[in-house]
Amino acid sequence: MNIEQFQSMLGERGISLSPRQLEQFEMYFETLVEWNEKMNLTAITEKEEVYLKHFFDSITAAFYYDFSNPLSICDVGAGAGFPSIPLKICFPHLKVTIVDSLQKRINFLNHLAQKLELSDVAFCHDRAETFGKKEHVRESYDIVMARAVARLSVLSELCLPLVKVGGTFIAMKGAAANEEIENGKYAVEVLGGQLEEVSTFQLPFEESERNILLIKKKRKTPKKYPRKPGTPNKLPIEK
């Protein structure tokens, strides 16, 4: 996906990018590749691949959810900033918090935010399990997002405690999400959520399947969740 295709395919979805926003994506790409030589941020470094599999793929969430309001977003395990930084570039009014367990990645994100002159972004070096226990952030975000971090039964325990009641947990998944959804429904329910919508589509050019899950937070998450670091992965909430 070249820059012209990136711009026109977003335009078809009603997302028009200014010259400044296109410049920010270009700087994002350059910074990502430069820092990737020093530390492992991504296996994808070829420009057209980055624009398709990182930038465009992240923004597909906006095809199924309205980001036009000044929402607060928490991105769990964003790594090199996906999906929240591409969304922030497209929708500058979003208030973004990224939680990641690796300090090196947080250093990269701080550098990136300064370089792109992003405001209303915060980067927290923490495990999602401990972050979700903190009173000032627990159940405080309009949206919590995660892209390919863990299976749904695990991911729900990391994300749903952070979503305010009435807010939305957006899980961005690859192919074969059906089985994962079936196995994850119980955890979603236990943690106060309800699966409202699953949107399945093909990423352009390579035709690989993507699934975007919209999970509504219906009631408060029981206080015992999330459990201590590592436990959700070892003992997921499954029937």
Swiss-Prot record:
| Name listed for the protein in its UniProt record | Ribosomal RNA small subunit methyltransferase G
The cross-references to SUPFAM superfamilies, in alphabetical order and at most eight, read: S-adenosyl-L-methionine-dependent methyltransferases
| Alphabetized GO MF terms | rRNA (guanine-N7-)-methyltransferase activity
Q: Ribosomal protein among the record's keywords?
A: no
GO cellular component annotations of the record: cytosol
**Coiled coil regions, renumbered to chain:** none
Role summary: Specifically methylates the N7 position of guanine in position 535 of 16S rRNA.
Q: Where are the transmembrane segments?
A: none
Q: Which Gene3D superfamilies does this entry report, sorted A to Z?
A: Vaccinia Virus protein VP39
Residue ranges of region Disordered?
A: 219-239
Q: Which UniProt keywords apply?
A: Cytoplasm, Methyltransferase, rRNA processing, S-adenosyl-L-methionine, Transferase
Enzyme class comes to transferase
Origin organism is Bacillus cytotoxicus (strain DSM 22905 / CIP 110041 / 391-98 / NVH 391-98)
What EC number(s) does the entry state?
A: 2.1.1.-
User: Which family does the UniProt entry place this protein in?
Assistant: Belongs to the methyltransferase superfamily. RNA methyltransferase RsmG family.
- Mostly located where? cytoplasm
Q: Which HAMAP family match?
A: 16SrRNA_methyltr_G
Q: Which gene encodes it?
A: rsmG
Its localization reads:
Cytoplasm
Instruction: Indicate which residues the UniProt annotation says bind S-adenosyl-L-methionine.
Output: G77, F82, A128, E129, R147
Q: Carries keyword Transferase?
A: yes
